[in-house]
Amino acid sequence: AVSGGPDSMAILDFLSNNHKVTAYYFDHGTHFGKESYSFLRDYCARKDIPFVASVLSAEKPKGKSLEEHWRDERYEKFHDYNLPIVTGHNLDDVIEWFLFSSLHGKGKIIPYRNRNVIRPFLSTPKKSLLDWCERKKVPFLTDPGNDDKKFMRSVIRHDMMPHAQVVNPGIQKTFKKLVEREYNLLY
């Protein structure tokens, strides 16, 4: 699954150089979706990677945030494909998701595997994926929604994470150990 961001572009680059893959893109119906769709379609055409896109419904049910609605729709589509789906979720996402789910009374970490969805970068810091893209000259887009504070994830990323890192400068190492222990990952 690709969004055009550095995480998914790093994994697409890595996998497409070593395996036969298809890039799956989910358009959330935002203005940025049109830009990322064109970017990904063109990138995949240049690299000879099959490209499949789906448009998700922007109408959310009552009682759900837009983020939750989009995530639920994406995963429903993932399961419809009934093929292994690899995502670029990384260690920074694990920490953000833990904080997000803790604020909602759940306190879970992102599962390494969920049915047909596999997340091999869960113990990899986002910076490593950015470094990969820079080293390999892999282009990527930055979604302006990542800075939009109407989304809880942006508040966590830009407001809470800097404070968490002051309280525990080794927070990434702490969560890396948690992920590796939880999923018995050997790196």
What is each PLM-predicted segment?
Residues 150-187:
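ATP/NTP-dependent adenylation/nucleotidyl-transfer catalytic domains that generate, transfer
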Residues 1-158:
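Core alpha/beta nucleotide-donor-binding catalytic domains of modification enzymes
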